[in-house]
């Protein structure tokens, strides 16, 4: 049984705090280490440790990055500065931690792909403006134990909805994935779990994904969209997200402690998707999803309470760490 722990932030933190919509960077970056523990689904199945204890490399070019993240030996790869390259996704090996050294660590024009791998951590990394022909900003396929944390993923909405692909797409039966503390913004189709209505044989019983403490801003749809899988979405702030959480094709979601501002469809079903909703502030929108059966998770977690989410998440989610 899940150990539900409600916390109340200090009054001084919450009182009178008004933050601009696109703000995601804290004025005081939090110090982090490569040994920080994953949580949510990524903490199960033996946990997700990435490349902790392995070799350490710092890269600042596309060629160096591509070389450093390949192979399955344990390794920590620090990204220093912005790397610009219009190219297909770079494939990441198992037992890898990709760490942005600070808020300037950005991959622009190309993304990363975790395919048929396990035990991968991506933290404090920016990924932006990856053209649809070059794949998703972050893709996870046929993989287990992946932790995406404190990232900043975006494109723009100046182009049509097919100019870019997904920001974070988790597909092909992947399991034990957590997306946390991430700023997901300025995009048409943000995050997909399960890529096709016809992929039930591969996806059913898999696609176990946690989304926690994320800031979603200026998104048209898929925040996230779940097919077939089992998902937990909690402690997240949604601003100007048209179509929010979509549960479909038999997916079971537990949606808790989120706040929506200026959303048209905050939580809804398509083709027999299901959700259980606890303590969500849907603003002017509502929950129209079919009632689900998922009422607990196989891990401990802390709920902020929907009234406290904005103050806790905005300014903390995104590339707000230093290493």
From Swiss-Prot:
Primary location group: secreted
The protein's required cofactors: Ca(2+)
Signal peptide: 1-20
Keywords, sorted A to Z: Calcium, Carbohydrate metabolism, Cell wall biogenesis/degradation, Glycoprotein, Lyase, Metal-binding, Polysaccharide degradation, Secreted, Signal
Cystine crosslinks: none
UniProt KW Aminoacyl-tRNA synthetase keyword: no
Keyword Ribonucleoprotein in annotation: no
EC main group: lyase
Purpose: Pectinolytic enzyme consist of four classes of enzymes: pectin lyase, polygalacturonase, pectin methylesterase and rhamnogalacturonase. Among pectinolytic enzymes, pectin lyase is the most important in depolymerization of pectin, since it cleaves internal glycosidic bonds of highly methylated pectins. Favors pectate, the anion, over pectin, the methyl ester.
Classification via PANTHER family: PECTATE LYASE 18-RELATED (PTHR31683), PECTATE LYASE 21-RELATED (PTHR31683:SF18)
Protein name: Probable pectate lyase A
Lineage: Eukaryota, Fungi, Dikarya, Ascomycota, Pezizomycotina
Gene field: plyA
């Amino acid at each position: 049984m899940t150990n539900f722990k409600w916390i109340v932030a200090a009054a001084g933190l919450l009182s009178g705090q008004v933050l601009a919509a696109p703000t995601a960077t804290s004025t005081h970056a939090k110090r982090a280490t490569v040994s920080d523990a994953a949580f949510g689904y990524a903490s199960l199945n033996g946990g997700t440790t990435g490349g902790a204890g392995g070799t350490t490399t710092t890269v600042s070019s596309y060629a160096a990055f591509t070389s450093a993240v390949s192979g399955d030996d344990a390794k920590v790869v620090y990204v220093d500065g912005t790397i610009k390259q219009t190219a297909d996704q770079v494939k990441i090996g198992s037992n890898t931690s990709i760490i942005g050294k600070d808020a300037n660590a950005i991959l622009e024009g190309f993304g990363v792909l975790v395919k048929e791998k396990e035990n991968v951590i991506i933290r404090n990394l920016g990924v932006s403006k990856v053209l649809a022909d070059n794949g998703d900003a972050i893709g996870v396929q046929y993989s287990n134990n992946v932790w995406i944390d404190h990232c900043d993923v975006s494109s723009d909405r100046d182009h049509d909805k097919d100019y870019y692909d997904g920001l974070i797409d988790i597909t092909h039966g992947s399991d034990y994935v957590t997306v946390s503390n991430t700023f997901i913004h300025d995009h048409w189709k943000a995050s997909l779990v399960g890529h096709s209505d016809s992929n039930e044989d591969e996806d059913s019983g898999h696609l176990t994904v946690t989304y926690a403490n994320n800031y979603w801003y200026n998104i048209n749809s898929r925040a996230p969209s779940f097919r077939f899988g089992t998902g937990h979405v909690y402690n997240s702030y949604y601003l100007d997200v048209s179509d929010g959480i979509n549960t479909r094709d038999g997916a079971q979601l537990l949606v808790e402690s989120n706040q929506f501002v200026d959303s048209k469809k905050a939580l809804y079903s398509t083709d027999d998707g299901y959700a259980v909703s606890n303590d969500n502030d849907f603003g002017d929108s509502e929950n129209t999803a079919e009632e689900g059966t998922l009422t607990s998770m196989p891990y401990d977690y802390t709920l902020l309470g929907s009234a406290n989410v904005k103050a806790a998440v905005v300014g903390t989610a995104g590339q707000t760490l230093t290493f």
